[in-house]
Design a protein with these regions (language model features):
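Multi-pass alpha-helical transporter architecture, strongest
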Residues: 2-3, 149, 200-225
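Flexible cytoplasmic inter-helical loops of multi-pass small-molecule transporters
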Residues: 3-22, 218-225
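Extracytoplasmic gate region of multi-pass secondary transporters
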Residues: 31-80, 174-179
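Cytoplasmic membrane-interface "Motif A"-like loop-to-helix N-cap segments
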Residues: 94-105
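C-terminal ends and interior cores of transmembrane alpha-helices
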Residues: 106-123
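Hydrophobic core of transmembrane alpha-helices in multi-pass small-molecule transporters
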Residues: 125-141
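A late C-terminal transmembrane helix in Major Facilitator Superfamily
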Residues: 151, 156-188
Length: 225
């Protein structure tokens, strides 16, 4: 399907610009944007992995739900989260990317600990679902627009490596280790420390959101390097 799609006008224009500079060398001209990708991704990917991959273990090991209950709750929450994505994307088209990211950051810092603490002590699948759904209403401020925000940071002809390299490294470090960090704290008898860790990661990203430009209003998507 990808091979039959038409390229965008910006990409076709970029193909006309022939340069011998390597992609990595070109990327070195954008250190600020690379750091922005890392900063805006760290908290969001940690939160995303918490409420997707780790949540199944959390519901079984900490909440005490059965396998069937865990499956129903996590699947229902994922469907709810999927529904939110285009809605939040539409909101960002109206108010800008930055404000939606800031909303995620502020709400994540304020409500991550209360949500996870309450979730740990619920007694059934329905309240568990409602709490995870509330978390998705926060996390979707990041997940719904993170890809387009990163794309809007870089000119067309280096966008793939500009987004892909720092994003992949950040997801591996902060997203891929979520389960290990959470279970590590649990094995030490301090499971709640993970809640503070996650809040701290979101807080770091919030600082980035506060000082970055709104990429909807100032996009590099149609520029050439």
């Amino acid at each position: 399907m990808r091979r039959t799609l038409h390229e965008t006008d910006a990409f076709e224009a970029a193909r006309q610009v022939v340069k011998r500079t390597s992609s990595l060398r070109a990327l070195l001209k954008y250190p600020r944007e690379v750091l922005l990708v890392v900063g805006l991704t760290a908290g969001g990917t940690a939160a995303f992995y918490t409420y997707t991959t780790y949540m199944q273990k959390f519901l079984k090991l900490s909440v005490g739900l059965t396998d069937d209950q865990t499956t129903v709750v996590t699947l229902s929450a994922l469907v709810f989260g999927m529904i939110l994505q285009p809605i939040y994307g539409g909101i960002s088209d109206r108010i800008g990317r930055k404000w939606l990211l800031i909303a995620f950051g502020v709400c994540g810092v304020l409500f991550t600990i209360p949500i996870l603490t309450t979730l740990q002590n619920v007694k059934g699948p329905l309240p568990a679902f409602l709490l995870i759904a509330a978390a998705w209403m926060i996390v979707s401020g990041y997940t719904s627009i993170n890809a387009v925000v990163k794309a809007e940071l870089f000119p067309t002809n280096i966008r793939a490596i500009g987004v892909g390299l720092p994003y992949a490294l950040t997801v591996s470090i902060f997203g891929g280790t979520t389960d290990s960090v959470a279970l590590g704290f649990k094995s030490l008898g301090h499971e709640t420390w993970f809640y503070y860790y996650l809040t701290g990661m979101i807080g770091i990203s919030l600082v980035v959101y506060l000082f970055m430009r709104d990429t909807k209003a100032d996009s590099a998507m149609h520029r050439l390097e």
